[in-house]
Amino acid sequence: MNDLDDSTDEVMGKYTVIALFGLDNRDNGTYESGNSDTIMLASINNDSKEVKLVSVYRDTYLNVKDDTYAKMNSAYQRGGPKQAIEALNTNLDLKITKYVAVDFNALVETIDLIGGVDIDVTPQEVAKINEYSGEVAQVTGKKNTTLSGSGVLHLNGVQATAYARIRKLAGDDYKRTERQRTVIEAMITKVQKSGVTTINSVVDEVFDDISTNITPKQMLSLASHALSYKMVDNSGFPFELKTKNMGKRGDCVIPLDLETNVIELHEYLFGSDTYTPTDSVKEKSKQIINDTGYTKETEAVKIQ
């Protein structure tokens, strides 16, 4: 964890930031390793209960361990949630301590327990949901039901998880992270309509199916405020980016540059206009520039 200045510590102390990891593991309940294909930060304003979600693109080229630079999703593979959190904290000047990790089974089970979610889907997305839902059903042992129509549809756990996996349409992985945030928002909307009793019941049911360092008591405390949470915005990180093939590490998302993007992240998450990047972030930013040749002056990709 980086040595942040007092003013940054004070600002961040007014928020609770939880790291959310979605693992693309086929073995249910295996959380020790695996690439985290979903990496999300949930920032909760402790006073206003306003919530912002930020997806860290899985292919973002960052320092994942020691002096190794690679795709961010490999940090979890290299050391589980502890290493993934360490990578988030040191690259982004954060002080995350809490996390929740889910696999296919945990996500499907949670969505089914709250009675499904309503999501606005296009005909192209419906076709992909039907294409992907077979594998999700097979992995989780759930029934596969074909979805028809388009527009606002009611999705069960298998269908919503398949929707969150869609990548091979316009927008590629960037759009996929948006779909993942849409599912999270739809789940929050649904549980808020269900009431505290349902929320507590869901927590009791799924707690053993997830990986987290949040205690049951802390989880119930968070759940008790669920009716007060207000989803105000969501986005993806890096904000300014370009892709580049990095040899053995494959096609990576390059922040333009890391230092500039981290400043914007702190402003976005915490409303901070006084944050100054630590020397650690500045050094990592310079290393990424050296490795890629991309700077903040490089023309950024326009995300669809």
Model regions: which residues?
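Entry/capping segment at the start of metal-dependent catalytic domains
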Residues: M1-S48, S221-S224
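Flexible, polar/acidic helix-loop-strand segments at domain edges
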Residues: D9, D112-G195
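Extracytoplasmic/secreted envelope proteins and their assembly/folding machinery
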Residues: T38, Y69, P81-N89, F104-V108, ...
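Amphipathic, coiled-coil-like alpha-helical scaffolding segments used for oligomerization/assembly
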Residues: R78-K142, T215, M219
